[in-house]
């Protein structure tokens, strides 16, 4: 069973939508940033400060290679995962890419008080617009995109469910049996 991979800019709701979608589909949920934090033993913000963005992106790429195999997961990715074409190819090999988007002002309202966003320093509103401009078109790799600023969480999940059903991504009797996140294979760096 293919993974359902949520992509989009920070603050578009990937984790919230992913968690809800996983519960409805009775599939394991994996947040790539949380998994990288678990493996590194420190928060993303500290990885960026102490080890640099290059190290974080390297860990992210390694995780994407592990996700190239369909495992029936719902995966919330970090906002910059699509900047590496190899990540996109690996994620697409194992699943269907669903995009989440929102207006810059909606994103600002969602992330402005969060201290855990390493790419948001200084004028947060301006930085969001700058990053969105830099990433213009990067999220177009999604097969289907929902504007989470225009829809409630339940409506967003419902629209994704409709798309998955229409495209045949939801197979009868393919729900996760264990309910936990399957062990990802160890891939040599």
Swiss-Prot record:
List, alphabetically, the CDD domains matched.
Answer: SK
Which BP terms in the Gene Ontology apply to this protein?
A: amino acid biosynthetic process; aromatic amino acid family biosynthetic process; chorismate biosynthetic process
**Record carries keyword ATP-binding:** yes
What positions does the entry give for Mg(2+) binding?
Answer: 15
Alphabetically list the UniProt keywords.
Amino-acid biosynthesis, Aromatic amino acid biosynthesis, ATP-binding, Cytoplasm, Kinase, Magnesium, Metal-binding, Nucleotide-binding, Transferase
Q: Which residues bind ATP?
A: 11-16, 117
What Gene3D superfamilies does UniProt report for this protein, alphabetically?
A: P-loop containing nucleotide triphosphate hydrolases
HAMAP family linked: Shikimate_kinase (MF_00109)
- Report quaternary structure and partners: Monomer.
Record's protein name: Shikimate kinase
Species source reads: Desulforudis audaxviator (strain MP104C)
The gene it comes from is: aroK
